[in-house]
A protein has these predicted regions:
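N-terminal amphipathic/basic-hydrophobic helices that include classical n-h-c signal peptides
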Residues: 1-25
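N-terminal alpha-helical interaction blocks
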Residues: 24-64
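C-terminal/domain-terminus segments
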Residues: 28-34, 141-165
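Short Cys/His-rich Zn2+-coordinating modules
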Residues: 56-71, 109-117
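Short metal-coordination and nucleic-acid-contact micro-motifs, chiefly zinc-binding Cys/His arrays
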Residues: 74-78, 124-130
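Short recognition patches in nucleic-acid-associated and regulatory proteins
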Residues: 78-79, 85-121
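Short cysteine-rich clusters marking metal-coordination/redox-active sites
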Residues: 81-84, 131-134
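Short, non-ligating residues that shape and space the ligands of small metal-coordination modules
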Residues: 87-91, 137-143
Length: 165
């Protein structure tokens, strides 16, 4: 990105690094990457267009549980919210897969994903950006991780819900 800026002759004087909503980290087993940037851009254009085809209530419709998860488990994003321009935009990394067993559908940190890539054969990571301030949320990326070795799901461990009903 810096090279593009240098070629065009427009160098940024900002102290912040170049902004990109992507959280694509170069992990050794990352494959089948799907970037939802075009869909995101289309939604934002529909929201900002003079004869709006998308109302703000429809675009900023984050579920209260998603906002709560973003406040407590989100990793700070390097971009501002595209709707309200808040700096509170965070990314959530959801993991899904048969080999994860009862751990499928949980939120994991980026460092945990690197460890999981060595533990599990294959699982899908879905990255969602969420703004707790205005409720904007959008899936920005999905990809597969894992070492490719087929494994059984881990044994189901008893949870608090199992004990107390």
């Amino acid at each position: 990105m810096f090279l593009l800026l240098a070629i065009s002759g427009k160098l940024s004087r900002s102290r912040r690094p170049p902004r990109s909503p992507r959280t694509l980290l170069p992990m050794w087993s990352q494959r089948e990457v799907i970037d939802y940037a075009l869909q995101r851009r289309s939604n934002l254009q529909a929201l900002r267009r003079p004869g709006r085809t998308l109302a703000r209530q429809e675009a900023c419709d984050a579920d209260p549980m998603l906002i709560r998860a973003a406040k407590h488990h989100g990793e700070p994003s390097n971009v501002d919210c595209p709707v309200c321009e808040s700096t509170d935009l965070v990314n959530l990394h959801y993991v899904f897969g048969d080999q994860l067993g009862q751990y499928s559908g949980r939120i994991k940190r980026t460092t945990e994903l690197e460890e999981m890539a060595h533990e599990f054969g294959e699982f899908k990571v879905v990255v969602v950006e969420v703004c707790p301030a205005c409720g904007w949320n959008h899936m920005i990326l999905s990809y597969l991780l894992g070492d490719g070795v087929k494994r059984k799901p881990p044994r189901r461990q008893q949870t608090v819900e199992d004990i107390y009903g």
